[in-house]
Amino acid sequence: LNLYECQGVVDVSALGGVHTLKLSDCRGVVDVSALGGVHTLDLSRCAGVVDVSALGGVHTLNLSWCRGVVDVSALGGVHTLNLFGCRGVVDVSALGGVHTLDLSHCRGVVDVSALGGVHTLRLSHCAGVVDVSALGGVHTLDLSRACVQV
């Protein structure tokens, strides 16, 4: 179900059974607690989304540019997680089990030592990350435009 840029969409509580749901740029969406059963969920640029604690069961989750998102501790079970531009995110220690993780432009992220189990990790434009020595187990690592000590 694609509801891209549907500004009138506010209540998504009845959409928890949908397999693939695109709510990108639906700025009226705030409460996503009923969407934990969605397989593939795109909430990119949903400015009102803050609490993502119920989304740990989502397989593929796009939260890019959701600047209100701060606490991602419940998302360790997500397979593919996009946090591109989530500048409020600081603590990523619970995300070591994520298979593919994009933290590009997450300026608050400094400590990535718990992410050694991630298969594919993007840290592009993460100037706060200076030590990647614990990431030896990462298969694909993107450090473009990041000042790090390798």
Residue ranges and their predicted role:
Residues 1-10, 17-30, 37-50, 57-69, ...:
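Concave beta-strand-loop units of leucine-rich repeat
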